[in-house]
C-alpha cells in the first residue's frame, strides 16, 4: 500500500473538524468574474512651473470614471562638474543628492475636493510609511532615487527621473478609487509644496585646516572628530592636499553646540599640549594633528549653476468603467471609509524629559513619531534628512550606527496611562513586527491600537474626538541645550467621504 493511501485511510473523529462536509478543494481553481474595466495612466500638468521651493497645483481632468494610483514625476537636472582655479577638475569638491531624494523633495502634498481639504500628507510621512509597508526595496529605491549614483559624493551628477508614489487612501486600494464620474460638480485638486534645492543636496568640503603630517590615515568618507576637554566637533573627511597640507572636510555640528570649529594649538598658550588637538577617525582611532597657530578655513560651496527641475508632472491612473457600473456610481449616493493623516507640528526639545501634547480627532488606529537631532539637517550639517538616530555616522553599506533617541515612552489619555512606560525598542522593533509587514530603520517609532495597521479593514481604534487631553511622554537620549532635537509625529485615522449630487465632502470635520 502506498504511503499516501495510508495517510488517506487514517481518518478519525478529529478529522471531522477539518475535512467533514468540505467547502473547498485545492485541486480545482475557483475564480469570480469581475466587472468590465480598463486603466490608463495619463499625464496631468501643473498650472504653474514646478521647481525647487515652489508650491504648485494640478486640477485633475475628468478623463476617466475613477482615479486610482498617482505618481509624481520629477526629472532632476544634471549637476556640472567642478573645476579648480587652474581650470583642472577639482580633486576635492563633491556633490550628492540626499538619500531618498524623491521623498525629500516633497514638503507636503494635499488633495481638495470642491475646494475643501480632504487629506494632507508629507514627504517624511511617505518615507516612514514605506519603511513599514514596502516589500520591494530595490524597485522603490530606483523610483525615489535612493541609489548610490545619486546619494554618493561625486564631481558632478547626471540627470535622473523620479517616480514618487503618493499614498492617499484611493492610491493604496483599488476598492477606494476616487469616483470622478460622481463628482461632476466638484474639482479635484492636488497641491504639492517642494523643498528648496539647498535642503535636498550635500556639497563639500565646507572647511579645511592645515595639518602637520605629510600623510593622513583617513579615507574618503571617513568620519572624523576632535575633542578638547568636554567639547567635541565632528566632520566628514573629503580629502587631503599633500602639497598645501590641507585637510578638507564637511563640518557637522549642532547650531547650539559650544564647540563651533576644529582648532589647533596656540603656541602662546604654554599650558596646552599639541596632542590635545588631534583629529581622530571616529571609528578606528587613527589621527592627524593640526598645524599650530592655524585656524579652520571656510571653503566655497556655491554651485556654478542654478538648479531647476527639467520637468515635473503627475502620472494619474484613470479607471474606465462599463456603462452599468458607471450609472450605478452616478445615480446612487456613495460613502467611502477613508484614512487621513493627522500631523502634529514639530516641537523643539533641549532636555531629555519631554511631554508632547497631541491634537487629534476622529477614530485613530496608529501613531508614528521620530526624534531628530538638529546637527543632522539644515545649513552647516551633513543634511542626512532621514537619519533619526543618535549618531551622524553611517557604515560603508549606508546603515546608521546610532541608536533610537527614544529610550522610554508612554501615551497619556486624560492624564491616565494608555499603557505602562516601555522602552524605545518596543516602539521601534516590536510594534512594527506585530502590526506591519516589515521593521523600519532605527529611530522610527510607532504604537498601534489596531491589529493590522496597514489594512483598510478597521480592527480597533481610539476615538480621539472624545479625549480631551492627549500627550506622549518620552525620555530621550543625548538631548541637551548643546544638542537640540525636534519631534514630529503622524497619526492615521478614519473618516467618511460622502459623494452625492455630484459633490463630495467629509462627514466629520476636524472639530467634530
Curated annotation (Swiss-Prot):
Q: Which domain of life is it from?
A: Viruses
Q: Which GO terms describe its cellular component?
A: viral capsid
Q: Which cysteines link up through disulfide bonds?
A: none
One molecular function GO term is: structural molecule activity
- List localization entries: Virion
Q: Which InterPro entries match?
A: Capsid_N, MCP_C, MCP_C_sf, VP_dsDNA_II
Q: Cite the entry's keywords alphabetically.
A: Capsid protein, Virion
Give the matching Gene3D superfamilies. Adenovirus Type 2 Hexon, domain 4 (2.70.9.10), Major capsid protein Vp54 (2.70.9.20)
Q: What family does the Swiss-Prot or TrEMBL record give for this protein?
A: Belongs to the NCLDV major capsid protein family.
Protein's UniProt name: Probable capsid protein 4
Amino acid at each position: 500500500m502506498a504511503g499516501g493511501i495510508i495517510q488517506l485511510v487514517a481518518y478519525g473523529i478529529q478529522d471531522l473538524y477539518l475535512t467533514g462536509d468540505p467547502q473547498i478543494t485545492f485541486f480545482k481553481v475557483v475564480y469570480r468574474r469581475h466587472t468590465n474595466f480598463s486603466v490608463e495612466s495619463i499625464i496631468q500638468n501643473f498650472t504653474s512651473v514646478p521647481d525647487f521651493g515652489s508650491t504648485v497645483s494640478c486640477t485633475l481632468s475628468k478623463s476617466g470614471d475613477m482615479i486610482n494610483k498617482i505618481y509624481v514625476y520629477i526629472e532632476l537636472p544634471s549637476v556640472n562638474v567642478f573645476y579648480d582655479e587652474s581650470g583642472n577638475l577639482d580633486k576635492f569638491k563633491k556633490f550628492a543628492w540626499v538619500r531618498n531624494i524623491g521623498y525629500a523633495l516633497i514638503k507636503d502634498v494635499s488633495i481638495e475636493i470642491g475646494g475643501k481639504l480632504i487629506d494632507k500628507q508629507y514627504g517624511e510621512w511617505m518615507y516612514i510609511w514605506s519603511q513599514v509597508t514596502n516589500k520591494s526595496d530595490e524597485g522603490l529605491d530606483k523610483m525615489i532615487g535612493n541609489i548610490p549614483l545619486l546619494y554618493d559624493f561625486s564631481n558632478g551628477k547626471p540627470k535622473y527621473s523620479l517616480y514618487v508614489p503618493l499614498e492617499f487612501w484611493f492610491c493604496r486600494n483599488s476598492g477606494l478609487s476616487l469616483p470622478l464620474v460622481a463628482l461632476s460638480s466638484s474639482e479635484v485638486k492636488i497641491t504639492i509644496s517642494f523643498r528648496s534645492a539647498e535642503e535636498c543636496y550635500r556639497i563639500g568640503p565646507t572647511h579645511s585646516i592645515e595639518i602637520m603630517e605629510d600623510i593622513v590615515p583617513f579615507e574618503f568618507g571617513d568620519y572624523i572628530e576632535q575633542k578638547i576637554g568636554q567639547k567635541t566637533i565632528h566632520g566628514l573627511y573629503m580629502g587631503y592636499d599633500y602639497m598645501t597640507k590641507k585637510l578638507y572636510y564637511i563640518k557637522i555640528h549642532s547650531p547650539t553646540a559650544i564647540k563651533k570649529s576644529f582648532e589647533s594649538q596656540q603656541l602662546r598658550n604654554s599650558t596646552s599640549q599639541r596632542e590635545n588637538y588631534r583629529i581622530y577617525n571616529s571609528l578606528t582611532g587613527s589621527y592627524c594633528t593640526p598645524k599650530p597657530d592655524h585656524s579652520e578655513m571656510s571653503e566655497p560651496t556655491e554651485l556654478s549653476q542654478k538648479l531647476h527641475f527639467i520637468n515635473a508632472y503627475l502620472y494619474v491612473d484613470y479607471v474606465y468603467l462599463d456603462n452599468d457600473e458607471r450609472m450605478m456610481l452616478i445615480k446612487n449616493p456613495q460613502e467611502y471609509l477613508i484614512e487621513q493623516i493627522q500631523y502634529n507640528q514639530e516641537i523643539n526639545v533641549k532636555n531629555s524629559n519631554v511631554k508632547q501634547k497631541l491634537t487629534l480627532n476622529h477614530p485613530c488606529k496608529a501613531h508614528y513619531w521620530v526624534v531628530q537631532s538638529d546637527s543632522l539637517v539644515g545649513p552647516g550639517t551633513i543634511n542626512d534628512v532621514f537619519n533619526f538616530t543618535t549618531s551622524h555616522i553611517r557604515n560603508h553599506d549606508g546603515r546608521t550606527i546610532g541608536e533610537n533617541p527614544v529610550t522610554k515612552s508612554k501615551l497619556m489619555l486624560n492624564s491616565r496611562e494608555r499603557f505602562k512606560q516601555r522602552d524605545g525598542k518596543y516602539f521601534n522593533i516590536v510594534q512594527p513586527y506585530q502590526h506591519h509587514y516589515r521593521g523600519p530603520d532605527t529611530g522610527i517609532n510607532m504604537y498601534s491600537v489596531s491589529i493590522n495597521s496597514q489594512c483598510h479593514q478597521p480592527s480597533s481604534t481610539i476615538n480621539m474626538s472624545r479625549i480631551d487631553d492627549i500627550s506622549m511622554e518620552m525620555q530621550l537620549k543625548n538631548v541637551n541645550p548643546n544638542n537640540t532635537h525636534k519631534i514630529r509625529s503622524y497619526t492615521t485615522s478614519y473618516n467618511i467621504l460622502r459623494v452625492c449630487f455630484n459633490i463630495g465632502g467629509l462627514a466629520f470635520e476636524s472639530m467634530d
